[in-house]
């Protein structure tokens, strides 16, 4: 696929974007309205899978597009270098690169058009978050950028709102065009949440979007892409499937977002990311967002971002939010059940509280959910063996508070952003300290406080040193029992008994099929009867 033909243009023409293979026609309901329906497709089998080769780009022949929309507010212009440095220091913000825009301090200073500003103010946000104060001017200026900030810091709106401005400045989609904005995310849950934000703030501009992810039927996703969408939020694997089978293309993408880039690389998506990005014109605007700054993310930045500017809120060192109270209990496997119940009783003293419990395996997820439900706790499980419909239902029940306790594995919980989670309980510790920080970051978001309880066993001894370091940085109280593991991790020869074996939770393993039940989605542990020993 090459774009060396000077006749290429947006809409119309033999080699145009939206050209002959779709046979004319159009679609309605989007920006500019009524264009009728899609015409017939051109030759060839639509379902044939085609290997994605890297195009030979000729920048001079590509249609021009606008990407700099930033008009600095007079109040921002008037700020001195000393004022800017003081603001960044106050917000623990560091910037790297050349010609970096000054941060803004209010929504009015951001320079958004009225139709965007109206949507923001209707949501009742008091002021921009730290990452938004610097990220919005960067994104609106059309620069390639890297944003590094902890989860729950407002990163989604940092790229979502500028994308709406970007879309409205581009020519309308023609039949056969792919999206203008592409957002890559590591998990289906995060992709769905990004879509919700895009829908919320893009509705007034009639900007259409779709969410393309695995584990769900392709039919609706294909229909959305065929009708035409300005924004596509996708997980890498499913998007490549859509590209290879000709269900969409990336020829119109001029605004690319890599969200939770570190997580995507952790999950092994680097080859897919590179294959996808190679399909997009190189003069696009690229925005990379990450919670950490490992060397793998740095390499991706060097390869795909052009003269980027970077904002980091907080330390590049791995750290937990200081709004989270971390409680670590050194226990045996046999003690976990009783300790869990005690903390649930504390957590649910607040009737509005939500509690997220992490388990290491899908089996443990189901077993503890069965146990809790039998004891009268309204718990539901979410993990990779649950079908997408059930996962969506569980998440909805948890968000609305109908089932305020959710038991999850790491993979299933990645990208989940639920407001009001007051307690996170690590029933099983994760395998590394990065996942620990990511887990407990589900609470204490956007300035609110939260509590994270972790059950630490002798089997987790390798995490002892890193865990103590994270707790010290956040000014947390480290129990003496845990400090012994800290010394051991730094070479102490002190030995401690292993404690009483693995033990664990026993209960029904059967996953079963879907049952009718409430909402028609429950399977296995989620369909276990709820005991009457609790106030629920």
UniProtKB/Swiss-Prot annotation:
Residue span of motif DEAD box: 259-262
Residue ranges occupied by any Helicase C-terminal domain in the UniProt entry: 326-486
The EC number(s) this enzyme carries: 3.6.4.13
Catalysis: reaction(s): ATP + H2O = ADP + phosphate + H(+)
Gene3D superfamilies, sorted: P-loop containing nucleotide triphosphate hydrolases
Pfam families: DEAD, Helicase_C
Amino acids binding ATP: 149-156
Compartments reported by the entry: Cytoplasm; Nucleus
Keyword Nucleotide-binding: yes
Region (RNA-binding RGG-box): 496-520
Residue span(s) of domain Helicase ATP-binding: 136-311
Short motif (Q motif): ranges: 105-133
GO-annotated biological processes: nuclear polyadenylation-dependent mRNA catabolic process; nuclear-transcribed mRNA catabolic process, nonsense-mediated decay; rRNA processing; termination of RNA polymerase II transcription
UniProt biased composition (Gly residues): 497-522
Notes on the domains: The Q motif is unique to and characteristic of the DEAD box family of RNA helicases and controls ATP binding and hydrolysis.
Function: ATP-dependent RNA helicase involved nonsense-mediated mRNA decay and ribosome biogenesis through rRNA processing.
Family of this protein: Belongs to the DEAD box helicase family. DDX5/DBP2 subfamily.
Subunit structure: Associates with polysomes.
Official protein name in the record: ATP-dependent RNA helicase DBP2
Record organism: Debaryomyces hansenii (strain ATCC 36239 / CBS 767 / BCRC 21394 / JCM 1990 / NBRC 0083 / IGC 2968) (Yeast)
Taxonomic path: Eukaryota, Fungi, Dikarya, Ascomycota, Saccharomycotina
Gene: DBP2
